[in-house]
Amino acid sequence: MEAVKTLIDRYGLADPATQDIGVFTNPILQQLYDQLVADGSNSLADALRVGAAIEEIDILDLEERIAQTDKADIQLVYENLMTGSRNHLRAFTSTLGKQTGDIYQPQYLDPIAYEVIVTSPTETGSGGQGRGQRQGQ
């Protein structure tokens, strides 16, 4: 999230984050958050499904945002976030299968795009983008 904060500061944008966990300034995000927390609170399987759904939404949102900018620094941060979301999607769906025997069905992604992601190996990002956070390099 440090990289996002750096971009917010660099471009003089208002920071929409609050200090309170689970509190959003955007009412649409707040409603989505509240619904997903309620949906995921029933069982481990439901929590894992909600986690996977969140990652699907994030991937689609990031793809849209990448296409809307020509700024390389913003694209890099979005691409790194998308790498994380794909890895998280793999983890949630894999854990769902191992822990419950359930097979996750994509809720937002195209089924082919989903299958490409979950059958691909775990990805690595660009480290700390030159801020000394790359391990072993």
Model feature map: region roles:
Residues 1-136:
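All-alpha RGS (Regulator of G-protein Signaling) helical domain and cognate RGS-like helical scaffolds
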